[in-house]
Each structure stands twice: as C-alpha cells, then as structure tokens.
Amino acid sequence: MAEGFFRSKKGFTVVQNEITRDVNISLKAKGLYLVIQAYISMPDKKWTKEDFMRLAKEGKKAFDSAWKELKESGYLKVHIMSDNGRWRTEYELLDEPEEGPHTLYHNADGKVTSDNLQRA
C-alpha cells in the first residue's frame, strides 16, 4: 500500500518548523505552543495565561511544567511593564527560540531595566 497523506483543511494554524523539529522540547510543551499559536491569532480576543490553563485537560501542574519549558527553552518571553503605577504582563510567543532571559522587566518608558538573570 502506498504511503498516505493528510488532507488539507481550511482554518488551520501555521507553526514554524523550528519547534516541531526541536528534539529538546517535550510533546507536552509543543502541544501547548500549538494551542497558544492557534488561539492568539483569533481577532477580537486578548488571551491570558489563565485562559490557556483552563483549556488544559491535564491540570495545572502539567500546564505549569509545559509553560516553564517553553520559557526556559526560549520560545516564550514574559514582559512585565510598569503602567501608571501598576504592573502589566504581556506574553510573547516566538517562532524561533532566543537565548538569554525569558522574563523582562520594563520601566514606564518601555526600557528593559532587569530580567530573570540579572535583577536591578
């Protein structure tokens, strides 16, 4: 029998091959990456970490483990910014991993003042 192929579908999510081929990333973390990528492209909705945690059938511990793995492997950046005396957090899902800090602290002007590797 000839090798089979998947039928193409409409309404699909495009994911960089980098993470799918990264042998250092667990399937759990790859799955979370894919889910996040699929949802953040939806218009008219701001997604939070908690929104994605609620989608995790495996529970908080498994979600936290995959989230941590994405941060530590460089696929997920956390930006913590001062906003009129309050802290605001934004998450950035990267197509390719970046070395260095995964959590960046910004002042009111948007300048990075410290990170998870070097606190000011």
Predicted features, each with a name:
Residues 1-10:
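N-terminal leader segment of winged-helix/HTH proteins
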Residues 6, 85-87, 96, 118:
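Short, intrinsically disordered low-complexity segments
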Residues 10-19:
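Short amphipathic alpha-helical segments and their helix-coil junctions
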Residues 18-30, 36-91:
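Winged helix-turn-helix DNA-binding recognition segment
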Residues 93-120:
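Charged low-complexity intrinsically disordered patches
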